[in-house]
């Protein structure tokens, strides 16, 4: 569970740093208020990084997701995909502020960003697999607890 906490904290730090970088870089270069991918990085990192891992942390506390192989796949693949996607946003944003349109730049940028999105998707599929497994075990535990409570009630009634 601590991996999810540290991932959330790391993405929080990166998200806040991205916001400061955008503000200071655009002021420094005279591009304040210019729309670019840099202006979106802050919220993307906070939502897809920090908030995602805080939600995963809560799910892990209930469903013990961290014990599953599919969760490990999710953790590393999702983080890698988010990192690739964010780096490509950074590159595209810097190029945009430099006056280059997407048509003027390499086709590799959207291609690599697409690979980042594919990694994010694979990670999310692995997360859903871990959640499904966790829900199945959680339902079994609830049914067993309900059965024990019922047995205790019946024993109490028959004694009384």
Where are these regions (language model features)?
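Hydrophobic alpha-helical transmembrane segments of multi-pass integral membrane proteins
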Residues: 1-160
């Amino acid at each position: 569970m601590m991996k999810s906490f540290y991932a959330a904290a790391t993405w929080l730090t990166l998200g806040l740093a991205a916001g400061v970088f955008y503000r200071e870089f655009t002021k420094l270069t005279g591009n304040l208020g210019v729309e670019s991918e840099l202006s979106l990085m802050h919220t993307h990192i906070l939502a897809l990084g920090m908030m995602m891992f805080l939600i995963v942390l809560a799910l892990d506390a209930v469903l013990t997701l961290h014990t599953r192989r599919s969760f490990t796949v999710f953790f590393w693949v999702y983080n890698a995909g988010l990192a690739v996607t964010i780096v490509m946003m950074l590159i595209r944003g810097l190029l945009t502020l430099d006056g280059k349109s997407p048509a003027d730049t390499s086709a590799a940028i959207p291609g690599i960003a697409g690979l980042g999105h594919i990694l994010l998707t694979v990670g999310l599929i692995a997360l859903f697999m871990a959640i499904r497994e966790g829900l199945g075990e959680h339902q079994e535990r609830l049914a067993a607890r309900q059965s024990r409570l019922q047995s205790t009630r019946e024993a109490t009634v028959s004694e009384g």
